[in-house]
Structure formats: C-alpha cells, structure tokens
Amino acid sequence: MENSEKLANSKEVIAYIAERFPKCFILEGEAKPLKIGIFQDLAERLSDDPKVSKTQLRAGLRQYTSSWRYLHGVKPGASRVDLDGNPCGELEEEHIEHAKATLEESKAKVATRRKEQAKKAREEAKAKKTARAATPPKRRPQPAAKKVEQPVETRALNADEITVGNNVSVNMGKGNMPATIVEINKDDVRIRLSNGLQMVVKAENLRS
C-alpha cells in the first residue's frame, strides 16, 4: 500500500510533480516555459492523488514559475510545453519582457538584501571592536615590595657585661641572633639561643 501522507511543503510538491511529469517540470538546469492554463491540467491529472491538494499545487506552481531557473528559460525562441512535454506555441513578447523584468527585480532585491546584511555584519564587528577597546585590560597586581630590614647596630661587649644570665646577641654569619649566657669558661662562652639550642662561642663574637 502506497504512503498517502500529504506532502509537507512547496519544495516537496515541485519534486513530486517533476517526478510525475519529467518532460514538463525540470529540477536542474534551465526550465521550460509552461503551457498557459497548465494548473487546470495539473489539477485534473492529480485530482485523485491523496498526496497533494489543489492549494498545494497552486503554491508549488507559483514557486516554480518565480524561480530564476524558470525566468531564464522564458526567452525569445522558446516554446511552451504541456505536462507531457509537447510544444504548445511560442512565447509572446509581452510574456518575455515580463519574465525579464521580474528576474531583474528579483536579483536586485537579493543584491540589496545581501548588501544590507554585509553592512549589518560590518557594523556589528565594529561595535564589538569598539567595546573591546573601551574595556581596559585587567592589570595584574604588582608584587608587594620586599621590606628591607635595616641592620640593627650592635657593639662589642665589655668584660663586665659578659655574665651568666645576661641577654646578648651572637654573630652567626647571616646576622645577629638573640641569646642568653649560661656558662663562662675564660674566652669560651656557652649560650642558649631563643630556639633552645646551646652552643659555645668566643666572647669576641658576643654583641650587645
């Protein structure tokens, strides 16, 4: 059983009638001018066809005859054809001029529309470029400047300042570190650093 579902749009209608009447309707290349009154012939031939209605046929035929392919085919020397491709007389000058004017008008509309679309695209691109230029780039935060520690001025201890329990500074090469004297043995002095570490240093390395 054949599928009797109706065709969805004019494009499908044109493809269908081109399949049914290939000598009349052409899908590729220059189309042939159609017989005047061909709609009635088409409606009669397809009156019992459940896939297409008269309204669909009229819309499909209108789209087919307004295409650039069809209008190009309406020219001097061309003959109209019926559904079976049989010649039905040459075109009249009036119809040729009308087709020519319609084609030129259609092409002009397309050219104008494309020009407007191109202009709109340029304006949108320009607007985006302007928006990007107006937005300042995000600045990266500058690293905080390292605080330069000023060296603490110290002096050598006097002999009477080298006593057990006295808080002193000891020169450790990388700088002076706080310490406490815990034992004295002539020039050797045992000290305890702030971290609890004990060590023996020369008295001359102790500072106040």
Swiss-Prot record:
Q: Name one GO biological process term.
A: post-transcriptional regulation of gene expression
Q: Where in the cell is it found?
A: Cytoplasm
The membrane spanning regions, by residue number, are: none
Give the SUPFAM superfamilies listed for this entry. Answer: FinO-like (SSF48657)
Which SMART domains does its entry note? ProQ (SM00945)
Pfam families, A to Z: ProQ (PF04352), ProQ_C (PF17516)
Any one GO MF annotation of this record: RNA strand annealing activity
Keywords, in A-Z order: Chaperone, Cytoplasm, RNA-binding
Alphabetical GO CC annotations of the entry are:
cytosol
Disordered: annotated span: 106-154
Q: Mostly located where?
A: cytoplasm
**InterPro entries xrefs:** ProQ, ProQ/FinO, ProQ/FinO_sf, ProQ_C
Bias type Basic and acidic residues, positions: 106-127
**What function is annotated for this protein?**
RNA chaperone with significant RNA binding, RNA strand exchange and RNA duplexing activities.
Q: Which HAMAP family match?
A: ProQ
Family membership noted in the UniProt record: Belongs to the ProQ family.
The molecule here is called RNA chaperone ProQ
Source species? Aliivibrio fischeri (strain ATCC 700601 / ES114)
